[in-house]
């Protein structure tokens, strides 16, 4: 039976799917593999460029900001379109190269006058929290106002890339709160994500996420900032502890239940030591 040739559109869809599911720290390896499979750089660049951008935004990819001692985060919350993003801390917009992971062509931008005092106060607290809890952590805080509603968004990213030891991992958390200045309470919503890929003598991925909801009393900028970070700290500590406990339980039960007398690889696994295979451990609070 004659096979129907794969169309360019289908090739782009498949390649884009590979790109979007690249494990943390392994974008370049996946890109090079699909480039070799496709053997058409023009089609790859023109057809899958949206996947490069989406991957970097989904992963909360950190980027170095010229002339500063901090990194910013690439995300959907600071996407200005046409490949440009902005850093609210330095109030600069920039062009971002999604393959080179570099910023260029900086321009000053004007902050949202209503949201900025709240954003700046929360940014200071977030910086201190990230520095004390995440060894290589990067954070960005975004603010915008619509009418009398202020929305603040916190993005936190940390990663450990250890290709020489055959594993890579990333922590991501995003938090949002919308409120009216100086009145009532507001709901703080968060999404926490951990992804680790371990590939020595096998191929194992840990992918975990959790949604959180908390209540915040709204009074002034400093009080809201401190209360939001207190709630974030409690929620993220609880989540990280739960992952560690779950992982230990899996080592003691699930992994042993999956054992075979001799795996398909024909190589025996020391199931009693599988908990030491590094998955998730390096993303715990330092």
Curated annotation (Swiss-Prot):
Pfam families: F-actin_cap_A. GO terms for cellular component: apical plasma membrane; F-actin capping protein complex; WASH complex; Z disc. SUPFAM superfamilies: Subunits of heterodimeric actin filament capping protein Capz. Its main location: cytoplasm. It comes from the Eukaryota. GO terms for molecular function: actin binding; protein heterodimerization activity. This is F-actin-capping protein subunit alpha. The lineage of its organism: Eukaryota, Metazoa, Ecdysozoa, Arthropoda, Hexapoda. The gene is cpa.
């Amino acid at each position: 039976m004659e096979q129907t040739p794969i169309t360019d559109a289908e090739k782009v869809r498949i390649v884009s799917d590979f790109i979007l599911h690249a494990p943390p720290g392994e974008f370049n390896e996946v890109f090079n593999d699909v480039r070799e499979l496709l053997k058409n750089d023009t089609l790859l660049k023109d057809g899958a460029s949206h996947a490069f951008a989406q991957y970097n935004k989904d992963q909360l990819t950190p980027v170095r900001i010229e002339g500063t001692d901090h990194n910013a985060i690439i995300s959907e919350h600071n996407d200005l379109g046409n490949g440009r993003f902005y850093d609210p801390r330095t109030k600069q917009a920039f062009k971002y190269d999604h393959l080179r992971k570099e910023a260029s062509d900086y321009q000053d931008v004007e902050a949202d006058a209503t949201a900025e005092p709240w954003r700046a106060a929360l940014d200071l607290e977030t910086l201190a929290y990230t520095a004390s809890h995440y060894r290589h952590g990067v954070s960005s805080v975004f603010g915008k106002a619509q009418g009398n509603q202020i929305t603040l968004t916190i993005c936190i990213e940390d990663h450990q890339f250890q290709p020489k030891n055959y594993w890579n991992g990333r922590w991501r958390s995003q938090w949002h709160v919308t409120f009216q200045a100086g009145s009532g309470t507001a709901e703080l919503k968060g999404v926490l994500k951990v992804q680790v890929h371990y590939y020595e003598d096998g191929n194992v991925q840990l992918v975990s996420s959790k949604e959180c909801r908390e209540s915040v009393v709204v009074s002034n900028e400093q009080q809201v900032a401190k209360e939001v970070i207190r709630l974030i700290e409690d929620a993220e500590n609880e989540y990280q502890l739960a992952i560690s406990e779950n992982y230990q339980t899996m080592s003691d039960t699930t992994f042993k239940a999956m054992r075979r007398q001799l795996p398909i690889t024909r190589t025996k696994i020391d199931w009693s030591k599988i908990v030491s295979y590094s998955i998730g451990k390096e993303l715990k609070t330092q």
